[in-house]
Design a protein with these regions (language model features):
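A shared catalytic/ligand-binding motif for oxyanion handling
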Residues: 1-162
């Protein structure tokens, strides 16, 4: 999504999002350039529109959403000046149903040489738990020089140099 830049339009944008969310059943995710921040930590200077921040924060609270963590950087937009303003305008928020189905949802930042925004990739942070099983691939036997030892390392008889 792309949020408007003008304050009057931002108020209408948030109301439109409320209306859309009200129609949603099941898991959903809002992602894109909101052109809004809800906390001072999302900007690298103190030039803040606190009234608009409050409106966005109330919208997020009322919508009962969770913000997806951003990996790789803190800010997603720069005005690209010598002393840049940096802001996290690009974000993703999910409902609780989404979080139940995709509990490891994340945003990964990517490099961009084309835009003043960095691209974000939606992904899952997967945890591998437990002991991993050995999996034999039958094509290995066709690889020249392949030798399979079914037992443990102690049964190989020899050193690592052999």
């Amino acid at each position: 999504m792309y949020g408007p830049q003008e304050d009057e339009e931002k108020v209408l944008f948030l109301q439109e999002l409320r209306n859309i969310i009200g129609l949603c059943n099941g898991p959903w995710l809002l992602a894109g350039d909101f052109n809004l921040i809800y906390q001072a930590a999302n900007k690298n200077n103190a030039n803040l529109d606190r009234a608009m921040m409050g409106r966005f924060r109330r919208f997020l609270d009322d919508s009962e959403v969770k913000e997806l963590p951003l990996l790789g950087r803190k800010y997603t937009w720069s005005n690209e000046r010598m002393s840049p303003t940096l802001v996290r305008l690009d974000q993703a928020f999910c409902c609780l149903d989404w979080e139940d189905i995709f509990p490891g949802s994340i945003l990964q930042s990517a490099a961009s040489g084309v835009s003043d925004h960095c691209p974000l990739i939606l992904g899952l942070k997967i945890k591998i738990t437990g002991k991993r099983r050995f999996h034999f691939e039958s094509f290995w036997t066709k690889v020249p020089g392949f030798r399979f030892f079914g037992g443990g390392a102690a049964e190989l008889g020899g050193s690592c140099a052999n």
